[in-house]
Amino acid sequence: MTDSQLEQDAREFVAAVTAGAPEGWTGFELTVKGGPGGPECDGWWAVPGGGPRWMRAVAGAGELLAAIAAERGWHSARLTVRGRPGGVFEFTAEPGTVLSGDTVVLDPGYVHPLPEESTPGSALPPAGDAARALAALRAFLRGRAELLGETEELAPPATPEQLAEAERRLGHRLPDDLRALYLTTDGSGGTTSLIDGRQLLTLDEMVEAAEHLRYAGKFRFAWDEPGDAVVPLGPRPHGAVRRCHDHPGWVPFTTDGSGNHHAVDLAPAAAGRPGQVLDIGADNYEGPLYVADSVTSLLVHHLDLLERGHYALQDDWPPYLLLDQDPDEEPEEPEWNDDGLPEAAGPDLQSVRITPRAPVAPLDLAPLDLAPLAAVPRLRRLDLVTRTATGLGTLRPLPVEFLRAGLDGAGLAPLAGHPHLGALDLACDTPLDLAPLRTLPALWWLDLSRCAVADLGALGELAGLRYLALTEAQWAQLLERDALPPALVAARSVGAVAAAEWAARIGHPAGESYRVEGLLAEGG
């Protein structure tokens, strides 16, 4: 492809973007990059009278990315486009790879799939009942009004047409009980808090919040901490909710004003119910919390708490009522963080991190026998930090996905064939045999920078490996052997700033960005 043809294609792409502009727009910014499912378009329109309006996918983006990358000799490309009506537009293409400090990322848009994002869902029917939900809401509002001494105004109802349009934009039909709620009140109106101390979003706010959560979810992934990024913990009841940080099937319908929401789950796991309610958002670092099997059950529960007297009246102005949400239950913590293993671990424990109470040299710490973990059937993460583990075979029947540990003389042999291990951060003093890594079907992340390794050649056979961290000397040996893992997406040279020559051998190109400028017509 010639430069003139490439420039023409870039101008046509900008014209296609602005052809879909909303009325009254005053500017836009769009970034296009490769992703696991094809090109990802992250963009927004500036529109007077409100916040940014998120931009949807643009036709032809993938083809243009590929054409520019091929013409420039890049592994991949990243596009940024900015403009305003009647003003200058800027179209910039850069290599899609990123070199930062000691790490090169060949595909910055890559997000490793979470364990249960696309597993088969529930075949169970919804648990909600529209009539019962509305009856519970009305009874709750009457009871609260009596306690507060004033009646609160609900918002006007949404029309069936407004509800249908919101569902079209969401790509989901809402559960019948939530639909009935919106056909009664589109938002909280004059109520201080309609559901569990939170405001009911309007339908327009619901769509905006859902789009924001989908956008923000792309930034949860971090190459340096796979345990947090890709091994979410599972909420109770087990098997009801997908183990994800976020999901397109989780539709927010309330807000606390600080980034936390109730959401209806329209993609439940096998033991869940369509329309079950989750607590998601900024404060749920480990993933969602299960709240109720339906909006109906949530509203009925609130009415029950009110009728049983599980509430407190706050003297602020305006006065409000605060429900005691968990008067009967203290859930077990799913994480353990201490200097030793728990003496009596419960069945809900999913993450164990062992940290010394005071700084201690690794060699001064006694090896840790993992045998007690046999009683932890849902263990997903095990982080021993600097401790050496003995009894690694204990982990064979457990669903562990992330392991950071020192290895004893048995090396990796006790882990051979483990079906779930996806991320390994290892340390050892004696030369390590990497052959057992070939038997780990889920392995995608590996840090051997704290290991002595007999032969790094086996790494070239790990077709599923996406991340590899080695020392500078280990990288030199691996590249000399021409044994780079074939599907590598990110690489780290531990203890040294990544040199351009090393990065180029990994796949990071040298080359200047490609830039086109022009004028946009008034109004697009």
Language-model segments: which ranges?
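Short, well-ordered, aromatic-rich surface patches in folded extracellular/luminal domains
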Residues: 1-18, 88-119
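Charged interaction scaffolds used for protein-protein
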Residues: 12-13, 20, 45-49
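Extended intrinsically disordered, low-complexity coil regions enriched in Ser, Thr, Gly, Ala
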Residues: 34-59, 89-102
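A surface-exposed partner-binding patch
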Residues: 38, 43-46, 118-257, 390, ...
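Elongated alpha-helical scaffolds
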Residues: 70-89, 245-248
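Compact, glycine/acidic-enriched structural inserts
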Residues: 278-309
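Low-complexity, Gly/Ser/Thr/Pro-rich intrinsically disordered linker/tail segments
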Residues: 297-357
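Concave beta-strand-loop units of leucine-rich repeat
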Residues: 326-341, 351-369, 378-391, 399-412, ...
